[in-house]
């Protein structure tokens, strides 16, 4: 088993130097040009003190700058801690402190007391210093840390190694295949593992990426028709937007795959795609699995509606209940294993031991397998709210609500929304005088916009069982009756 590999981008620039690597709007960059840009960023980062083994926070939007920073950190041998640009300042500061980063590189206005903050422009306008570029990557070494929320609501830093990212890209290629003319349209944020994984595929496959800086359905719709795109990653909301713009038309036959994540797609949506000849591949994955770990081929779009498919070639999946593997059609916890699965969480030994046992990742998600081994996901970590492809954990919102002096109890569940799929709804027991408007405003100051409840309802008491555990299913029933 290999322990090291040549520096990925440097090797790609050597093998196919003049092949187009990245397109952003009208700009085209070849692999050798990308390598040269990254070396320059690497030398500037070296001057500001970034060294091998250190953790550097990256708070940037999709763009050439973010791409070069991520690669430059790997050239130095530093770990990139990728931060969600939609989080509140308070949330970002907590994650940076937890990850023990030595500095933040950003393209946004941001101030932090205890952490040096460098704007990308500031870094690039400063002096250079000769950098010690990593000629080889150790597959066991951490490359990135991406935060994901747990059922406790406290975010956990998922450590993904070079080996994890390599295995993810290989598994995807064995699943979807590779073509010389492939072009993947990247519209997912690169601070999410789904977006980041495309950067890995880009340099490993030597595949052209058409990068969209910000989600723009009109631009994407046009690009699918005119830019030679063969693969695109989407969530249901994006797919719905594209079909609205497509109307009675169709996309070119060269579009061979729409990789759909973020939860099962409604059957009418899939039927429309079948009618229009759009091949939709439904997937199941998470940050801990370096992106997808299961995929449903377009061949089964309608015969296996609601299924997330079967595991990637080098991965395994089973359903457990009370620690025992159960037969088909019996519901239980989804447990997965593979070289793309994280080895654990940063500084969270207890959570790592609880979640990963003998190499098997206990996802906390509920599902079952049918008689042919197709996975059906019933609940994403049971309480998870998926809003426009973003994961929202009720416990984090409840923690914020309970920090208000006029809130005695709080419970949050998902509420169906035509635009986003789901949005948070809060139920509150008051300890003093407070209005719904005041509660929502309080949340706006503490949480990312997409996490702020769209409604706050007041109850005399929250439904609980004998152990005083909150009964979310009863709150969901109240939402349905509203």
UniProtKB/Swiss-Prot annotation:
Pfam family, one: AMP-binding_C
Pathway in which this enzyme or protein is active: Quinol/quinone metabolism; 1,4-dihydroxy-2-naphthoate biosynthesis; 1,4-dihydroxy-2-naphthoate from chorismate: step 5/7; Quinol/quinone metabolism; menaquinone biosynthesis
Reaction equation(s) it catalyzes: 2-succinylbenzoate + ATP + CoA = 2-succinylbenzoyl-CoA + AMP + diphosphate
An example molecular function term from Gene Ontology annotations: o-succinylbenzoate-CoA ligase activity
UniProt-listed Gene3D superfamilies: 3.30.300.30, N-terminal domain of ligase-like
Keyword tags: ATP-binding, Ligase, Menaquinone biosynthesis, Nucleotide-binding
Gene Ontology biological process terms from the UniProt entry: menaquinone biosynthetic process
Signal peptide: none
Matching PROSITE patterns: AMP_BINDING
EC number: 6.2.1.26
The family this protein is said to belong to: Belongs to the ATP-dependent AMP-binding enzyme family. MenE subfamily.
Cross-referenced PANTHER family: LONG-CHAIN-FATTY-ACID--COA LIGASE, NONRIBOSOMAL PEPTIDE SYNTHASE PES1 (EUROFUNG)-RELATED
Function: Converts 2-succinylbenzoate (OSB) to 2-succinylbenzoyl-CoA (OSB-CoA).
NCBIfam families: menE, PRK03640.1
Protein name in UniProt: 2-succinylbenzoate--CoA ligase
Gene name of the encoded protein: menE
